[in-house]
Amino acid sequence: MTASERELAEQLNRRLRHVVLMLRRVSADQPITSQQLSVLGSLEHGPRRMTELADEHGVRLPTMTAQINRLERDGLVTRGRDAADARVVTAGLTEAGRDRLAAGREQRIGFLAERFADLTKEERDAVAAALPALDKLLGAP
């Protein structure tokens, strides 16, 4: 790693931290935490194994189980069993969970869209041009 790569990594780290904290503040009035909203997002395309969710979110299985317990209690997720292995517990979104995810996502996107309105066209174009490199850097799908 070169000194310039390290400096760029430090600058990006600071900005990512700021973005995460800013979006958490925007979502502070939501009835669920930003972490719970993130878990709902992980279930958007269908039920997932609890172990997969824990791995994706970088937490231990008991921590994810506690998150799913709260979301299930609130009617946002349901538990099921894996069709291939009935011993495996899965979690999936309910309609209420989909609605909550959509509302949380819309709140964040609306906030960011307002912020983009403060930028010049050239600044917005620069952000848009950086997105493919950020996807590659962060391993985004």
Task: Outline where the language-model segments fall.
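N-terminal leader segment of winged-helix/HTH proteins
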Residues: M1-S34, K136-L138
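Short, locally clustered residues in the helix-turn-helix/winged-helix DNA-binding domain
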Residues: G41-H45, R105, P132
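N-terminal helix-turn-helix DNA-binding core of bacterial DNA-binding proteins
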Residues: L23-T63, N69-R70, D74, T90
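Charged, amphipathic alpha-helical coiled-coil/dimerization segments
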Residues: N69-A129
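Exposed, interaction-prone assembly regions rather than primary DNA-binding/catalytic cores
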Residues: D125-P141
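Alpha-helical structural segments
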Residues: Q11, H18, E44-H45, E56, ...
